[in-house]
Amino acid sequence: MNNLESWEAVIGLETHVQLNTKSKIFTSASTAFGDAPNTHIDPVVCGLPGTLPVLNETVLEYAVKTSLALNLNVAEHCKFDRKQYFYPDLPKNYQISQFDEPLAENGWLEVEIIEKDKDPYTKKIGIERLHMEEDAGKLVHSGSDRLAGSKYSLVDYNRAGIALCEIVSKPDIRTGREAAEYASEIRRTVRYLGVSDGNMQEGSLRCDVNISVRKGPNAPFGTKVEIKNMNSFSAIQKACDYEIARQIEVYENGGEIFQETRLWDEAKQLTKSMRLKEGSSDYRYFPDPDLGPIEITKAQKEIWFNELPELPSKKRNKYVNEFGLSAYDARVISDEINMANFFEETVANGAEAKLASNWVTSDIVGYLKANKLSFSELKLSPENLAEMINMILKNTISGKIAKEILPELIKKNISPKKLVEEKGLAMISDSSSILPIINELINEYPNEVQAFRNGKTKLLGFFIGQLMKRTKGKADPKLANKLLAEKLNG
């Protein structure tokens, strides 16, 4: 068994965020996903002779906003470079990227690490740089769409030329969990900004992980290995954990780690060697002669900074410190901007924050999951949820009735007050309506009444159940308990 505690992992992430612009980074070709192969291409995408790229201004705006949200220093001057390598999915045999003068450098992101049976903690992870580049095409392999065993491969260039932001972290990450949480916070941030949908299954957010291990925090860095092919946050965590253990085992058995690229095999839950890793000199970078330098004024940066929304970390702090929510509930609500906005509007309409949180994170999220809906598809208005919550507090309806009417409120988005009136679901909260039913029960169940009076006080629950059954759950529970106890103690 490996002595994991005597080793320290050193992890950095390269995160590729696909920007959701309508057209590609250097041409007007569409970025639509899921259409027939090679329908969103043009001479610029294919690199035909005589074509010239022109930077999409929205790409620059989205990239700067992402940089500012990640606390990066945005350069006043940057440029594009050609990254040269041969692969079938690269139509020009070079990729337009940024090398020595990236858009932004030296930022950071705080992430919350919550693990079962461990104390939660917050970690500040440095970000080396953010640069803009174009995406490559996609190889489609025959058979199972895997290279191994396929008879031929086809190339779909629909993705080629789509705008990417590559976000490179500093080697500040130490565990697979931290790596997964960092990637998750990146996705949360770009979704809040509206610059990307961050869909890992569609390739809108892709992460490559660089991992090495060393003997303690003061030892020099070991040889790093790059891991690819992780399409979920859980895969990132599992791939990191596996690779850390693999490298430690190699070292402890007297072996050597090579600088290589490995693929995560989800089915086998292990990493497999793909190729030796190239260095930057292998790409022969040089400035792209077809694209001029980019100048970004302080005034323009200030305009874009002022357009940033309240980001997830600030919302979490606000929910805990101002709204009194638990750290867990604050995390769940802030995970999606539509949920966060809905929750805040519900509170603004008079609902108590903790009650609003319970309804949003439990009942509403449960309904949406059961019906395979996203929060953006929710028809229920914050005003109507706040009204329903306050009806419970005023004893107009019970919590049980509220849960029963919630699906209809979500489907129709009608006033809870109106729905309760139409269905006759208002809580019975006057003694004169409840006492006759209690008297009926006492007359019908004399043996149970005598048993209660002889000390079997748990029978109170039996009578409460019978009362609720006859009132169809509409009797005020507190009043019902009080009146029943008085009668039974007779």
Curated annotation (Swiss-Prot):
Main EC class the enzyme belongs to: ligase
SMART domains (alphabetical): GatB_Yqey
EC number(s) on file: 6.3.5.-
Biological processes annotated in GO: glutaminyl-tRNAGln biosynthesis via transamidation; translation
SUPFAM superfamilies named in the record: GatB/YqeY motif (SSF89095), Glutamine synthetase/guanido kinase (SSF55931)
Listed GO MF terms: asparaginyl-tRNA synthase (glutamine-hydrolyzing) activity; ATP binding; glutaminyl-tRNA synthase (glutamine-hydrolyzing) activity
InterPro entries: Asn/Gln-tRNA_amidoTrfase_suB/E (IPR017959), Asn/Gln-tRNA_Trfase_suB/E_cat (IPR006075), Asn/Gln_amidotransferase (IPR018027), Asn/Gln_tRNA_amidoTrase-B-like (IPR003789), GatB (IPR004413), GatB_C_1 (IPR042114), GatB_Yqey_C_2 (IPR023168), Gln-tRNA_amidoTrfase_suB_CS (IPR017958)
Catalyzed reaction equations: L-glutamyl-tRNA(Gln) + L-glutamine + ATP + H2O = L-glutaminyl-tRNA(Gln) + L-glutamate + ADP + phosphate + H(+); L-aspartyl-tRNA(Asn) + L-glutamine + ATP + H2O = L-asparaginyl-tRNA(Asn) + L-glutamate + ADP + phosphate + 2 H(+)
Transmembrane segments: none
Entry keyword set: ATP-binding, Ligase, Nucleotide-binding, Protein biosynthesis
NCBIfam families cross-referenced by the UniProt entry: gatB (TIGR00133), PRK05477.1-2 (NF004012), PRK05477.1-4 (NF004014)
Functional description taken from the UniProt entry: Allows the formation of correctly charged Asn-tRNA(Asn) or Gln-tRNA(Gln) through the transamidation of misacylated Asp-tRNA(Asn) or Glu-tRNA(Gln) in organisms which lack either or both of asparaginyl-tRNA or glutaminyl-tRNA synthetases. The reaction takes place in the presence of glutamine and ATP through an activated phospho-Asp-tRNA(Asn) or phospho-Glu-tRNA(Gln).
Subunit composition and interactions: Heterotrimer of A, B and C subunits.
Entry's family note: Belongs to the GatB/GatE family. GatB subfamily.
Protein name: Aspartyl/glutamyl-tRNA(Asn/Gln) amidotransferase subunit B
Source species of the chain: Prochlorococcus marinus (strain MIT 9312)
